[in-house]
């Protein structure tokens, strides 16, 4: 008699706009069989759990409930979206000190619960908070992953797809580096059906500046949304659910994530956005893309900026680390 598989269990920490959108996306797509939600606003979570469960008759069965940290013990995945939101005029890096303190109050009780699964960090600044989660938790590097440039890459695919009149899913393109102001597109690789976007632009008699215009548009998209409606959540909530699905379903999928550097791009001791393979055991492989000299300079500059802010924030906040 075949042994019944354990239901896939996800704990979400943070039930704000991003967290609740992630939860709704998980319900809509039928990802995981159990979803516990933790937030300091306990009544709000209870209401959200009931509301989300009301969608299950038209999606798939799922146990959804207001959770607490001991519930993390047997979870497969803990997703962290909790943190101070980015306000108009702020960069993601401006959030670092306050969100490091919030993160510390989350990671410690999750680890103390006996959790042996995978951390997926979504809160900003995601590269720094992912590295901090790894250091605070004492977990192996393959069990701490950040959403990285997944949203930025999706935005880039959307813009290129619109320009070339193709479905964004047919665009092979990546944004690399920090999920923030120093991110950059890998134009030496980015293509549609093998035709580099740079060559397509040239063949259609567009100025070379078109590539920089696209870069700027993608980089500024979050600021535009925040200025207009106060926050971004649909894109990142859906992207995060996609990452969760790839992990829980053991897809061995290549995604642009915030992952640890161990010599890739000449970088060490930080997490930054690059393609990586993920599956049921977490991070399986970090992919070092071949970059042009200019792109390598941009990657180094992005890493330098992250390290500068991270080192300063770690000293100022006095965050306790296990490694």
Swiss-Prot record:
Keywords: Cytoplasm, NAD, Oxidoreductase, Phosphoprotein
Binding site for substrate: 86, 92, 124-127, 152-155, 232
Residues the record marks as active site: 179
InterPro entries recorded: L-lactate/malate_DH, L-lactate_DH, L-lactate_DH_AS, Lactate/malate_DH_C, Lactate/malate_DH_N, Lactate_DH/Glyco_Ohase_4_C, NAD(P)-bd_dom_sf
Binding site for NAD(+): 18, 39, 69, 83-84, 105, 122-124, 147
NCBIfam families, alphabetized: L-LDH-NAD (TIGR01771), PRK00066.1 (NF000824)
Subunit structure: Homotetramer.
The protein's name in its UniProt record: L-lactate dehydrogenase
Organism encoding this protein: Lactobacillus helveticus
Lineage: Bacteria, Bacillati, Bacillota, Bacilli, Lactobacillales
């Amino acid at each position: 008699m075949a042994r019944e598989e354990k239901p896939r269990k996800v704990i979400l920490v943070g039930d704000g706009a991003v967290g609740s959108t992630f939860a709704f996306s998980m319900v809509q797509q039928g990802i995981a069989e159990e979803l516990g939600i933790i937030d300091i606003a306990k009544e709000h979570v209870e209401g959200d759990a009931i509301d989300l469960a009301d969608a299950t008759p038209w999606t798939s069965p799922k146990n959804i409930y207001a959770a607490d940290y001991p519930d993390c013990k047997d979870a497969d995945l803990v997703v962290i979206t909790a943190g101070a939101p980015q306000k108009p005029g702020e960069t993601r890096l401006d959030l670092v000190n306050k969100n490091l303190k919030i993160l510390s109050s989350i990671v410690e009780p999750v680890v103390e619960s006996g959790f042996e699964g995978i951390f997926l960090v979504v809160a900003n600044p995601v590269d720094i908070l992912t590295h901090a989660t790894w250091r605070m938790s004492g977990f192996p590097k393959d069990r701490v992953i950040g959403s990285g440039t997944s949203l930025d890459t999706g935005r880039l695919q959307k813009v290129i797809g619109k320009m070339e009149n193709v479905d964004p899913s047919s665009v092979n393109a990546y944004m690399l580096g920090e999920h923030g102001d120093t991110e950059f597109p890998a134009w030496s690789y980015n293509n549609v059906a093998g035709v580099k976007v740079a060559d397509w632009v040239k063949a259609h008699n567009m100025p070379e500046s078109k590539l920089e215009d696209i870069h700027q548009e993608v980089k500024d998209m979050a600021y535009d949304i925040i200025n207009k409606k106060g926050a971004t959540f649909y894109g990142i909530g859906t992207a995060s659910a996609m990452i969760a699905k790839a992990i829980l379903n053991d897809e061995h999928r290549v995604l642009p994530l915030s992952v640890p550097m161990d010599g890739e791009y000449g970088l060490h001791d930080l997490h930054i956005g690059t393609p990586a393979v993920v599956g049921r055991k977490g991070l399986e492989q970090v992919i070092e893309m071949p970059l042009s000299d200019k792109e390598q300079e941009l990657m180094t500059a992005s890493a330098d900026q992250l390290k500068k802010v991270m080192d300063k924030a770690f000293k100022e906040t006095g965050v306790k680390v296990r490694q």
